[in-house]
Amino acid sequence: MEMLSGSEMIIQSLIDQGIKYIFGYPGGAVLDIYDSLKSTKKIKHILVRHEQGATHMADGYARATGKIGVVLVTSGPGATNSITGIATAYMDSIPIVVISGQVSSSLIGYDAFQECDMIGISRPIVKHSFLVKKTEDIPITFKKAFWLASSGRPGPIVIDLPKDILNSYNKKPYIWPIEVNIRSYNPITKGHSRQIKKAIDILKLSKQPVIYAGGGVISANCHNELKELAEKLNIPVTTSLMALGAFPGNHPQNLQMLGMHGTYEANMAMHYADVILAIGVRFDDRTTNNVKKYCPNATIIHIDIDPTSISKTITAHIPIVGNAKNVLQQILVFINSNMFVKEFYCLKKWWIKIQSWKNKNSLNFDTNSDNIKPQSVIKTIWKLTKGKAFITSDVGQHQMFAALYYSFQKPRRWINSGGLGTMGFGLPAALGVKLAFPNETVICVTGDGSIQMNIQELSTAMQYELPILILNLNNKSLGMVKQWQDIIYSGRHSHSYMKSLPNFIKLAESYGHSGISINTPKELEKKLQLALEKLQNGHLVFVDIKIDASEHVYPMQIRDGGMNNMLLRKNGQK
């Protein structure tokens, strides 16, 4: 059998793992890998324009497909440029594997050219990291890395590869491991039957229950089980920002998103609930507000694959450790076998109360304005795409408008940086999604601040012919910063106004793309339809939309209050 070099073993390991795409940027420490990559047609490499873009593309690909995204960067600045993307994936539990080059083993620790301690730098923001010290360790290291990235609570893995490992030859034939065993890592996948029985007993007695679904529902692919459980028990469902689409947006039991900018009915239902069934959530501060005032009358049932997430922020009265899909299936088996549904209590009074909160119409906005409302942009694009598009977003007001006004019916259609809140995520993530689903409509919703963080990836889109639609909600300001300054800092605007902006249309055209400008409400739908037609003809279309700069996102929770403390839009209020 032919002996392989370290770099050849890496490529073969990726092939054996079933990897189809690598997002990367070459440099001296990884040129051996790139040389070996050239000899295979089984893996397509996407040459990005910045390593942060590579990590976000891999991230977007992973979120949309449920598969592992792979990144390849060189040592030193190549590795450090990937850090923001790694942290983004870590905060949202997204499986990516980052392969970073390193200086030769004999030079590590001697401040060699483009040396940095990638293992040390990335340690707080990875699920695990590997420094490969022997060429023969490459296959088992890659096998472990991909298994760790996708098992249990998913997350990013870093594999650091000294240059001398890449051009050395193994003394034994290459063999891809059939299985991997890490004694210290054995995630619990099924819930304890005693805890499940406790949870069901509590739910049976509940008068005002709520199901709170988080991103873990999407990671575990248990949206069908969630829907079945909710319908059997007639319990209202609310989702986190990360879980939009895990429960159909148009379902009558859906209270929509909860949290800082969640709907009035979702937050009120959470506050007054007597039982909360939390599935795959981590109770972050944007969904709890003041933890001391959080859902004061609720018994918390918390299902999560990661035991360290349970009772970390909010104490769980009934903790259930396990894969969310397995646990929900266990609950459903118990309910069905015990004819629990037929004897289930009536929640009529609870639904009447919820309807009274819905009647507040907390997502209302002025539809007769002379200026384009960002809500109108999202609702119009939803209408034109029939709610079937993949939507990626950056971070800010536009992110919240997209989350609130584009009703997602399926999981993995909403791609955003929820935990780290990374500006510059939307465009490269959209390219990763488009690569995975070339026949689907992919839309990046962004703002004039965020889009400039990674706008160079327009070049990548042109090189690989990845037609996406970019909706730039342009208010000439850092919208969410400005909103906070208006509401919390008494209107004192400090460095939130973008005085000098590029001509986005000409900028897009300079990369070879199409550009459309929208300035009035009357032309909004017509020009968005035109943009979609151009998109179907294979063009990336950059739509610059001049929106009402005074528009704020409502509802908005009051700082340090309970879930029920919110600011709502009033008549005439911006």
UniProtKB/Swiss-Prot annotation:
The keyword Amino-acid biosynthesis applies. Pathway: Amino-acid biosynthesis; L-isoleucine biosynthesis; L-isoleucine from 2-oxobutanoate: step 1/4; Amino-acid biosynthesis; L-valine biosynthesis; L-valine from pyruvate: step 1/4. Mg(2+) binds at D448, N475. Keywords: Amino-acid biosynthesis, Branched-chain amino acid biosynthesis, FAD, Flavoprotein, Magnesium, Metal-binding, Thiamine pyrophosphate, Transferase. InterPro entries: Acetolactate_synth_lsu (IPR012846), AHAS_TPP (IPR039368), DHS-like_NAD/FAD-binding_dom (IPR029035), THDP-binding (IPR029061), Thiamin_PyroP_enz_cen_dom (IPR012000), Thiamin_PyroP_enz_TPP-bd_dom (IPR012001), TPP-bd_CS (IPR000399), TPP_enz (IPR045229). FAD binds at residues 153, 261-282, 304-323. Pfam families: TPP_enzyme_C, TPP_enzyme_M, TPP_enzyme_N. Its EC number is 2.2.1.6. One of its GO terms (cellular component) is acetolactate synthase complex. Binds 1 Mg(2+) ion per subunit. Thiamine diphosphate binds at E51. It catalyses: 2 pyruvate + H(+) = (2S)-2-acetolactate + CO2. GO terms for biological process: isoleucine biosynthetic process; L-valine biosynthetic process. Contains 1 molecule of FAD per monomer. The role of this cofactor is not clear considering that the reaction does not involve redox chemistry. Dimer of large and small chains. Belongs to the TPP enzyme family. This is Acetolactate synthase large subunit. It comes from Buchnera aphidicola subsp. Schlechtendalia chinensis.
